[in-house]
Amino acid sequence: MFNFANFYQLIAQDTRLQPWLNVLPQQLTDWQNAEHGDFGRWLKALNKIPQGAPNQVDIKNSVTISNDTPFHEGELKKLESLLRTFHPWRKGPYTVHGIHIDTEWRSDWKWDRVLPHISPLKNRSVLDVGCGNGYHMWRMLGEGARLTVGIDPSHLFLIQFEAIRKLMGDDQRAHLLPLGIEQLPKLEAFDTVFSMGVLYHRRSPLDHLVQLKDQLVSGGELVLETLVIEGDENAVLVPTSRYAQMRNVYFFPSAKALKVWLELVGFKDVRIVDENVTTVGEQRTTDWMTHNSLPDYLDPNDPSKTVEGYPAPRRAVLVATKP
């Protein structure tokens, strides 16, 4: 069983987040009562991971954990075996006491594209929607955020996050909750909200943008990253079935169309700050994620297209302000 008591205590002392306590404990109790086939096995492995007290942690330039006194070889082998229990590792990379977790995604590349364009995170409370295993949450703390809260309904992502947090020495500035954005009340409590790699999974993208806006304080900043297509403000791709072998994908606007959508739901100062074609260097199969990945999803005869014939993945970052 997971104990979220530390987070409850934390938000009880935050006047902006206090109202969340009206619904959150019951939501997480319901989640605890819903079974997941592998969760018990993952939890046993998590409990065997040693509680860290590392004296060298770098979350500014990477996510790296180490000690002046290195682990013995046997301890390292045991730790690596436990971490591999949580396969597949999709978001990262992490370096833990010399163990390099080479994840499917180079999430650090995305962070490097996003960071120059956003307001400084120092002393901000941050919400990361669809946070995966929390890689970017650690990088947000590295930029001085006061608190990072991530939401993602995946059981495995929560386990991976808690494993890294345990090795970090139980850092209580970051918390991952196994929830979807639709389960959050209108909090209007966060200084910055990130939604990266989520919008195209939403059946109603405008509703998603409103949900994000509802979590921001007045004057707060939205950082939105999603798959887009080339085109003008009227261009939108709606795949008929899969896109790059992904199910549950719905709307791929152009960056210009997405800017219009953000303005339509009430954001101001909307900026397109980055547009980038995803390469097979950024998303690929690794020793820590051995399933198919981007190279398998592109047309082998024309890598500018997916196997379904759609334009290959292109991602845009937009930044906007809530009035």
UniProtKB/Swiss-Prot annotation:
Major enzyme class: transferase
Ligand binding (carboxy-S-adenosyl-L-methionine): 91, 105, 110, 130, 152-154, 181-182, 196, 200, 315
Enzymatic reactions: carboxy-S-adenosyl-L-methionine + 5-hydroxyuridine(34) in tRNA = 5-carboxymethoxyuridine(34) in tRNA + S-adenosyl-L-homocysteine + H(+)
Keywords linked to the UniProt accession: Transferase, tRNA processing
GO molecular function, one term: methyltransferase activity
Keyword Cytoplasm (UniProt): no
Signal sequence bounds: none
Superkingdom in the source lineage: Bacteria
Alphabetical GO biological process terms: tRNA wobble uridine modification
Pfam families, per the entry: Methyltransf_9
Enzyme Commission number(s) from the entry: 2.5.1.-
The protein's role, per its UniProt record: Catalyzes carboxymethyl transfer from carboxy-S-adenosyl-L-methionine (Cx-SAM) to 5-hydroxyuridine (ho5U) to form 5-carboxymethoxyuridine (cmo5U) at position 34 in tRNAs.
Quaternary structure, from the entry: Homotetramer.
Recorded family membership: Belongs to the class I-like SAM-binding methyltransferase superfamily. CmoB family.
Protein name: tRNA U34 carboxymethyltransferase
Gene designation per UniProt: cmoB
